[in-house]
C-alpha cells in the first residue's frame, strides 16, 4: 500500500460491495454505501487508479459449460537459483490451463491449479511442460473430486480492521 491513498470506511464498503456484486450500477453502489452517485463514482475511479480494483469479471459456471477436471499439482524444481524460478514462472504464466500458480515455502516449490477437459488432457499438458525443460524435478497431481468451498471474495473488513 506504499504511496496508495488511505482507505476510509466508505472505501472499504465500496470494495466489499464490488467484490460481491461486480456488475452493480453506480447508483445502487452509491445507495449501498451511503453516498450520492457522483462522489461514489469518483471514489471508485480513485480506487481503480490506485490499484485497489484490478479488474471486473464474470464468474463462469464450468459445470454448465463443459465437462472438466480440476487438478492441483505440487511442483519441485531441480535447482533453486533465481534464474530457475524466473524461467519456470515466466513459462507457466503462458499456459492457459494453469489458472493459479503459487510459490510456497515448505516441502515443494509451487502449487498449481489446472483446469482441463479431462485427466488425459492434463497428462498431455504435464508431458509438454516436462519436455520444455522448465527445471521440473518432480511433481505430484491431485484430482479434485468436488469443491467444498470456493470463495472468490476475501474478508476485506477483517483484513483491514486494526482494532
Task: Label each region the model flagged.
Residues 1-163:
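A compositional/biophysical signature of low hydrophobicity enriched in polar/charged and small residues
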